[in-house]
UniProtKB/Swiss-Prot annotation:
Biological processes, Gene Ontology terms: protein K6-linked ubiquitination; regulation of barbed-end actin filament capping
Protein name (record): Myotrophin
Record organism: Xenopus laevis
Origin superkingdom: Eukaryota
InterPro entries, per the entry: Ankyrin_rpt, Ankyrin_rpt-contain_sf
Classification via SMART domains: ANK
PANTHER family for this protein: ANKYRIN REPEAT DOMAIN-CONTAINING PROTEIN 39-RELATED, BRCA1-ASSOCIATED RING DOMAIN PROTEIN 1
Organismal lineage: Eukaryota, Metazoa, Chordata, Craniata, Vertebrata
Record family assignment: Belongs to the myotrophin family.
Protein localization: Cytoplasm; Nucleus; Cytoplasm, Perinuclear region
Keywords: ANK repeat, Cytoplasm, Nucleus, Repeat
Gene Ontology annotations for the cellular component aspect, listed alphabetically: BRCA1-A complex; BRCA1-BARD1 complex; cytoplasm; nucleus; perinuclear region of cytoplasm
């Protein structure tokens, strides 16, 4: 199985499949198709259980994708409060700026997320 199947599992919250990929040797910090890491895809889609699993397996919490976007920024852009909460609790850098020049706090209009980032 390749990137497409792994990315599908990451985006759709199939934790069992993600665990199988990782147990089979998939690097949790590998750059996938699209120039993004597994953590970015999970964060984009609000898959907090997968985010938590990947972090436990050593995923780089501050990894930037090909556009300079971190997983925390991805979660902020998409309004995924639980993922933002996980990233903040695990020490994600809240000051990294995305390609638009905005940090995590500045990049969201969601008040619940802003409260987590203060």
């Amino acid at each position: 199985m390749g990137d497409k199947e792994f990315m599908w599992a990451l985006k759709n919250g199939d934790l069992d499949a993600v665990k199988e990929f990782v147990a089979g040797g998939v690097d949790v910090n590998r750059t996938l198709e699209g120039g993004r890491k597994p953590l970015h895809y999970a964060a984009d889609c609000g898959q907090d259980e997968i985010v938590e699993f990947l972090l436990a397996k050593g995923a780089n919490i501050n990894a930037a994708d090909k556009h300079g976007i971190t997983p925390l920024l991805s979660a902020c852009y998409e309004g995924h409060r639980k993922c933002v909460e996980l990233f903040v609790s695990k020490g994600a850098d809240k000051n990294v700026k995305g390609p638009d020049g905005l940090n995590a706090f500045e990049s969201t209009d969601n008040q619940a997320i802003k409260d987590l980032l203060h």
